[in-house]
Amino acid sequence: MSTAAARPGRRFTVGRSEDATHPDTIRAAISEFLATAIFVFAAEGSILSLGKLYQDMSTPGGLVAVSLAHALALAVAVAVAVNISGGHVNPAITFGALLGGRLSLIRALFYWLAQLLGAVVATLLLRLTTGGMRPPGFALASGVGDWHAVLLEATMTFGLMYAYYATVIDPKRGHVGTIAPLAVGFLLGANMLAGGPFDGAGMNPARVFGPALVGWRWRHHWVYWLGPFVGAGLAGLLYEYLVIPSADAAPHGGAHQPLAPEDY
């Protein structure tokens, strides 16, 4: 698993200037780019393929199929990246880890750029390989207000970030760490079953950004940034400061040690 889980957190840090060109930072960014592209291609592709097979996708069976595809795709994406970059595959997860002091701001910026580019490239590849099918994007269901959706996105992403912290970052995760990709992936799928009919269950700004840019659909787009960032940020702070004992997070009486270049 990621060495990030064994590193002390507890303090927001900008990072050192050399972090921007350090090979570990570049490798981690490439890992996030590829993992996010893998996830978005399979996730968005499952929706496009369902639309190809059936005229009406808004059925219980369709929701289950798309949720399962998202769950499995995220599990694989996290698994292939967790030992290199921490397997965030989500700007909101990166934000939660940043607030918890688990990576520097410089590295977080590289992660965000890589994740967004990965989502855009995956969506473009889907449009190219499907003969120009337009990605459906995300939208609010009838009767769902903007702030209802923000709260829903925050709640679902809070759970996702909490699960990530518990299975990937927590120093005492033990053997639970071996199921981290499945735990995070299955929770994403479960949240899609719960929230999909209301706002599409984004939980991942990169996942929403790719189809929005390629399909040029920006209505309510801010909802899928604000909600996940608030939820992930709260979960990261809660787990870092209330769940992880201070002795595990910061040795020598809580003294902070600067993040090493290999930290995620």
Curated annotation (Swiss-Prot):
It is a multi-pass membrane protein. The chain crosses the membrane at residues 28-48, 62-82, 105-125, 149-169, 176-196, 224-244. Keywords: Membrane, Repeat, Transmembrane, Transmembrane helix, Transport, Vacuole. GO terms for cellular component: membrane; vacuolar membrane. It comes from the Eukaryota. InterPro entries: Aquaporin-like, Aquaporin_transptr, MIP, MIP_CS. Expressed in leaves and at lower levels in roots. The keyword Transport applies. Belongs to the MIP/aquaporin (TC 1.A.8) family. TIP (TC 1.A.8.10) subfamily. Aquaporins contain two tandem repeats each containing three membrane-spanning domains and a pore-forming loop with the signature motif Asn-Pro-Ala (NPA). This is Probable aquaporin TIP3-1. It comes from Oryza sativa subsp. japonica (Rice).
